């Protein structure tokens, strides 16, 4: 009996020490347009490794699909690293993609806009199917927000469709439209969807709440 108690004590002691000393920090990969690349998230204490090498303010959904499909390589610290390697070696994945797609169409013309949105959604599903080949503690897809004084129905439809396919893969869809819609205090300027520091800070708070327990 004493041996059993001693073994139990040793086990509990080891378990406690492990939990106290275990590294709780996370590695985070952000890909897509500039909305995903959040300076406040980068400097947060729960993230010890932050990679933003596949961020480009001009990326569209098809760009990311092709980058992953053809396993594009970039140079990091004088070494070539493929997108597949980065996708394999991170705890958290954050994606923001499609803002360029939708605003390009709105600024061009709105003819057949719902067909265009459905094509966006289909492309996003192709992208998420590629992402689903990898394992993460958390995948967050950043939703779309309306900076115009119109098109509310379009953004409602777009977010609804994107959230449905995100849920299909059991990923988290970050709905920002209610927070950022027609709110110039979060934007660099009212004619562009790019965020200012206040906007990034607001989004980082939401994301940290969603990943802090991993």
Give the residues covered by each predicted segment.
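Active-site segments of SGNH/GDSL-like serine hydrolases
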Residues: 96-102, 128-157
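Short hydrophobic segments within beta-strands
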Residues: 31-32, 142
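Conserved SGNH/GDSL esterase-like catalytic core that processes O-acyl groups on lipids
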Residues: 25-29, 35-119, 194
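Conserved beta-strand segments of alpha/beta enzyme cores
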Residues: 52-53, 138, 170-172
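Sec-dependent signal peptide cleavage junction
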Residues: 17-24
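Extracytoplasmic/secreted proteins, especially bacterial periplasmic and envelope-associated proteins
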Residues: 30, 49, 63, 112-115, ...
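Catalytic His-Asp segment of secreted/periplasmic serine-dependent ester chemistry enzymes
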Residues: 145-214
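Hydrophobic membrane-insertion alpha-helices, especially the h-region
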Residues: 5-17
């Amino acid at each position: 009996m004493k041996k059993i108690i001693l073994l139990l004590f040793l086990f509990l002691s080891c378990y406690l020490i492990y939990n106290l000393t275990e590294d709780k920090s996370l590695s985070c990969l952000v890909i897509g347009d500039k909305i995903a690349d959040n300076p406040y998230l980068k400097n947060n204490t729960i993230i010890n490794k932050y990679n933003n090498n596949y961020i480009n303010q001009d990326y569209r959904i098809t760009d990311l699909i092709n980058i992953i499909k053809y396993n594009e390589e970039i140079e990091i610290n004088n070494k070539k690293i493929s997108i597949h390697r980065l996708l394999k070696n991170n705890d958290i994945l954050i994606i923001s993609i499609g803002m360029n797609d939708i605003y390009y169409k709105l600024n061009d013309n709105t003819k057949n806009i719902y067909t265009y949105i459905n094509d966006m959604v289909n492309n996003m599903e192709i992208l998420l199917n590629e992402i689903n080949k990898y394992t993460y503690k958390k995948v967050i897809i950043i939703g779309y927000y309306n900076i115009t004084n119109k098109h509310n129905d379009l953004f409602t439809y777009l977010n609804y469709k994107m959230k449905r396919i995100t849920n299909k893969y059991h990923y988290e869809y970050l709905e920002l439209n209610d927070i950022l819609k027609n709110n110039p205090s979060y934007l660099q300027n009212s004619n562009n969807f790019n965020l200012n520091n206040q906007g990034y800070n607001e989004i980082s708070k939401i994301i940290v709440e969603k990943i802090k327990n991993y």
